[in-house]
């Protein structure tokens, strides 16, 4: 048994300058692990609850001192002496200690910080990289990156409705080459935008955030950038979008300010996506329908699920009970995985396993409010997920994950493999 010797949490800042929770777990062997929790801007209504202080005089109400106190004063005394290598046992205890459906008493940010830090401490004690500790001997698949190079919606202060436009270098032979292809396309995209007199300031996730004449103009400039970088759209590099449709869904309709026909029914939204899939190498649509539009999701899946990856984020929130219902009802064909949506490492792994068993694909994801923590890079390899979303080719909190994947690829050597097009079952 490897006993937990101490647990300490602190308040740090994320990439948006908002407070978040960082925890450090030390084992009796002297090995330790430190983990920081991310935070989202567009969130599903059924996500595990992120505890904020609500004091307007401090960090505009976004402080996390209560969550930190919950770790230091309530969680720490009760987990000291527990087996640091028993991740399932620790996480089950934390869930029981909280006692709520959404981890709202202690805070999912408090619970997750301890869960992640304990996993890192145990990996260090075993003298294993985190991906090997969590995934075992079979962890060897480097994920295809979905690189968010144009930001809109809740991630940027512009007029673009679609939250993310991503380049997907699925045609690369290795992860390192995929990263290079993405970076070169990103730099060419900046040139394309500048040539059109468009703003090249970046949004929360490091992508450009220009005002555009329409949502489709974003697709057009992406195509130009891919070709300008010397790559073939639909062979070397594909396109993915995160509509985050819940953000513009109201009173049963979708309201898109950048469109000539701004109000759309579910059927019209599906036709909108179908038209794009016909004109562009659109390999993936995330949150194409609102989380509350279950019927719209089913219709979208019936219409496009055979040739486009349809990822559920807000609709599933990494929750196995909701994912199970989606699988049974024919909603989406892929699940986005975010650690802080559910709040423990164990529940995250359970969600991934459920998706894979149902024949769904899995995309490991960051949040718009990130830190230098690289856990999700290891998680992607540990689970052989095959796909990762961790932002653009700028901002160090995004690049940190890419650099960690480069290190993992180097460490795996000939035993590693880049997922490429095999990650997509469409």
Swiss-Prot record:
Gene Ontology biological process terms, A to Z: glycolytic process
Annotated positions binding Mg(2+): 242, 286, 313
First-level EC class: lyase
Principal cellular location given in the protein's record: cytoplasm
Localisation: Cytoplasm; Secreted; Cell surface
SMART domains with a match to the protein in the record: Enolase_C (SM01192), Enolase_N (SM01193)
Entry annotated with the keyword Secreted: yes
Xref: PANTHER family: ENOLASE (PTHR11902:SF1)
Function summary: Catalyzes the reversible conversion of 2-phosphoglycerate (2-PG) into phosphoenolpyruvate (PEP). It is essential for the degradation of carbohydrates via glycolysis.
Family assignment from sequence similarity: Belongs to the enolase family.
Name used for this protein in its record: Enolase
